[in-house]
Amino acid sequence: MAKAVGIDLGTTNSVIAVWEGGEPSVVPNSEGNRTTPSVVAFTDTGERLVGQLARRQAILNPKGTIYSAKRFIGRHFDEISDEARAVTYDVVEGDGGAARFKVRDKLYAPEEISAQVLRKLADDASKQLGERVTEAVITVPAYFNDAQRTATKDAGRIAGLEVLRIINEPTAAALAYGMDKKEHETVLVFDLGGGTFDVSILDVGDGVVEVRSTAGDSHLGGDDFDRRLVDYLADDFQQENGIDLRKDPQALQRLFEAAEKAKTELSSVTQTQVSLPFITADASGPKHLTDTVMRSTFEQITSDLVERCLGPVQQAMADAKVGESDIDEVILVGGSTRIPAVQALVRRLTGGKDPNMSVNPDEVVALGAAIQAGVLKGEVKDVLLLDVTPLSLGVETRGGVMTKIIERNTTIPVRRSETFSTAEDNQPAVDVVVLQGERERAADNRVLGRFQLTDIRPAPRGEPQVEVTFDIDANGILNVTARDKDTGKEQGITISESSNLDRSEVERMVQEAERNQGQDQALREAVDARNELDAVAYQVEKRLAELGDAAPAHEKARAEMLVSDARAAVKEEAGVERVRPLTSELQQVLAGLAAHQGAATADGGPAQHAATGGPTSGGGGGDDVIDAEFDKG
């Protein structure tokens, strides 16, 4: 049976875990790390890099390195102006107003980028587990709307995964924490990740994890803290040197990396040094950035971000009807919860309670997702997960107001119906506009979709009865139907168009991802083969130098010719069909020279044989890279 895994698809880093041996465990990637950077890069040579390899080259390739794709997934271009300004790559408007990433004249959907991260996670885990990973539970922020959830599911499909379930990150964390808890506890999960903030109140105990409320801010995360530090450093430098480093993509990328490092260090020390030599240059020569950042300064420039966490916590507690004294445990999730000011805020909001430090904030979400995968596959018994919908859902009714059909924090799956009528005499059709949000005015909420119910029999206004049904499945994805009670005619919509991709686009991306996997594998094989050839050529040259005149003339001439051919093949980026025979010939020559050297050094100790195999530039194929106008009746 194929392995089902849990995946925490994060803004900054992602984690994959599996249920095995009666417990969930994180599966390391091919580099041996338990977290994988959610970064994808496209190089000048056409190579696609994912994870740590992509992150390492970001400074030299700021326009071709895509990070924080999660902040754009399932969103339209007119929604992401702030996020687009905060990255070094180009975010443009695609078909239908969708957000797209532009790299070397090609457009990529956020779903495609996320799919590359998911594919690497699944491929690496397959190698570690010894069997193919094809099914996954993927987590999303609790405050993700329907479009973002559908887009995440699309990303999984593009990656070649069957997405068993989409679950909320705080819920997954509580599942991992509370699975073995026998006593009933009320738990607050405070989840501040790279790009999103969620808070959930849950009841945990005796195999049941029930979400009572959730709230959040899908535009707040660690990236925002980094940006404040970048602006602080850049403003200081501009004041001193008259140069705005934010206008240079390469300098900006270096600033972001330095800011992230400084933020991390300031969680454990009270001051840190930022040193970026040769950050830029002007007519007077090169410029260096050196600055000392105090924790107190960092807290001052990010204080409003910390305070933005206050509202969602208070909202969640009010919705769940709990006070400070009712909270038994506080679980911190996400790397940004290590910031001391954030931890101080949590203590302040929970009556001074210290957070539970027994869970790893970077891994707990993936572990919970793996448990849910085990539940869905029948491997985990006696565990019940009761999640909620984070935002209210309804329709636009007469006067341009939103009439809610499903209130926020309703346990899912759920099915609710309301009956509406026409607003005009002899009205032949009604337009159903499906909305998500908490505002009274329809225009202030997000439109998830719209459809029309036609052929309503002529009748005075208020007489026809139209039943509108909202059905949310366990993934939090919505189906809406409208039925004319008189004629029985029905029309409906699955809110999957709320994704920025239609079905044909998803299919195209699936096929392209599969093609690219083969191309990327071939590219990686060619690079590794050339690296191996270069290494063997170097060893032959070294051996010739060591032998000097002791090398037989005919072997020396052949070796020098082959080395010259090897250097040309590497320089010309030759394919494996040319490179591998050359490597084989050079290895034979090297073996022959080694024999001569052995004879020449027989009376002076053994010859030192250098390794000849293996690529010199890391990694194998593991990184291949990848309106209605109704009146209520």
Curated annotation (Swiss-Prot):
Chain ranges passing through the membrane: none
Record has ATP-binding as a keyword: yes
Induction description: By stress conditions e.g. heat shock.
Keyword vocabulary terms for this entry: ATP-binding, Chaperone, Nucleotide-binding, Phosphoprotein, Stress response
Domain of life: Bacteria
InterPro entries from the UniProt entry: ATPase_NBD, Chaperone_DnaK, Heat_shock_70_CS, HSP70_C_sf, HSP70_peptide-bd_sf, Hsp_70_fam
Keyword Oxidoreductase set for record: no
Stretches for region Disordered: 600-633
Pfam families: HSP70 (PF00012)
Start-end of Acidic residues biased regions: 624-633
Gene Ontology molecular function terms on file: ATP binding; ATP-dependent protein folding chaperone; unfolded protein binding
Modified residues (Phosphothreonine): 196
Stated family: Belongs to the heat shock protein 70 family.
Job of this protein: Acts as a chaperone.
Protein name: Chaperone protein dnaK2
Naturally occurring in which organism (per UniProt): Streptomyces avermitilis (strain ATCC 31267 / DSM 46492 / JCM 5070 / NBRC 14893 / NCIMB 12804 / NRRL 8165 / MA-4680)
